[in-house]
Amino acid sequence: MAGCTRKLTHLRKRIHRPRRRTTRRWKRWFKFRKRKGEKRPRPNHKAVARRAKLKFSTSEKLHWPEQELAKKSILNAEDSLIIDNKRSISHLSSGVLKDIFTTGTSSYNVLLQSKEEKKYHSQKQSSSTYSKRCRKPSKSPNTSRSKDPRRMKALVPVTSSGTWYCLERRPAVFVTSSVSSPVKFTHDISVTGNGIVLPPKPKSKVKWCHFSTLPKPKPQLSRSFEKGDDFSGKKFCILTAIKPTNLEKEKLRFFKSDYTYNPQFEYANPALPSVLAKHSHASDRFLKQIVVHLTEDLLSRASMTVVNGCPTLTINVSTAREHWLEGMLRHEIGTHYFRGINNLQQPWNSWTGRKKHELKPNNPTEEGLASIHSVLFRKDPFLWRAALLYYTVYQASQMSFCELFKDIGRFVKDPNTRWDYCVRAKRGWTDTSQPGCFSKDQVYLDGILQILRYRDTIDFHLLTALGKVSYEDVDRLKGLAVTENMRVPHFLQDHGRYMEHLEKIMEVNELTDRELKDLI
């Protein structure tokens, strides 16, 4: 039992007396304990004294005593802990001591800069060069001279005769100043024996900047439309560039003028004149076959009549809206999305690939196919919207905004609906009092009629699987295409039913193969 107590006491002493290099000592202790019949070696008194000196000289807790201690000193020159004065004696000038003790930046210790003035200046230059290289904020001269706390030297006054002790990690050195210091201190410095570890010097947080030669990624724009440049070199989608910024303001002004004021549109990033000129040519190819009348007074959903020898389609707008959402999903998802996904797998998925394989523009096939899918499963699949857009664009190329607004009033009674059609046709133009149009809206009807014209020879399943291609390129590209894992909408799975819906569209809109052959 006594042996156990002795072992526990010994363990407690080891636990409550932490020293430096703990891991190495514990390994050594366990190694000795493993040896059978051998006792733990007793500590070396000289080593204990040496570690005490290191512990004492590494960090000291300094304070200003309240009483006058000018003639008192905790450290004595005859003490055994103060080493002998034969080792590295440093001589400090009074200027260095004055500069050290009058800075006011060291609250706990006073630093010894160097042995000589020359070495001090060289270290200062090297530290300033390093700080510039690291892009650290500027420091005061006092702060820049501070070193690692573990390497600091502390000067402690022992007597009032100009004698100083230099304390560092090595055994303390007795320093005698050859020149008496003219500085008078109101309080002396005393050193306590219980040393604590001084907190490390606070490091200023430096914000590192990363400089890369790579250009920043730009937001991707839609490839479906041409781009317009602004003065800063940025590229914008043509549909974004021609969107007026003062649309609501001009709309109120137009309605207050009783439809006599021609709006003056403004644009944040106007399209280039060359781009507008390319889209300002309207066609009258299908005008003689189209008359559309939108109204809310019609009892039925729609009706087809003949007025003055011209076929007229009358649409009840209020009842037709309930089918728009389903048609919009087939238009955007079932056509544009699926063809876009399939196009990514093909060799012509880039502009370079399209040029290499000599592909024709995907419009009007793209928008014509999407417009057909919008009305594919409707009870009355009228093509009145595509026809009205085609007509409005052509009239806009011949009329001012006010004249166009009055002209389509024959077919559209609601002023807000008429405003929307006129704005679409006049997009990109600043002064709408002049004739001019944005001709993109004509591709819907143009594409519809071309697809219906060649519906018997087009492979619609392959037309979707090949991606963004024209129906004219399908036969030529099918041998080069990647057809595995292609996505096709559900309404194209049954080819027979799909063709029946196309025939119904022809019948409802009173289109015949002979008329289509004459037009196309």
UniProtKB/Swiss-Prot annotation:
Residues 116-153 are annotated as: Disordered. The active site is at E332 (nucleophile). Binds 1 zinc ion per subunit. Transmembrane segments: none annotated. InterPro entries: MATCAP (IPR012548). GO terms for biological process: proteolysis. PANTHER family: PTHR31817, TYROSINE CARBOXYPEPTIDASE MATCAP2-RELATED (PTHR31817:SF3). This is Putative tyrosine carboxypeptidase MATCAP2. It comes from Homo sapiens.
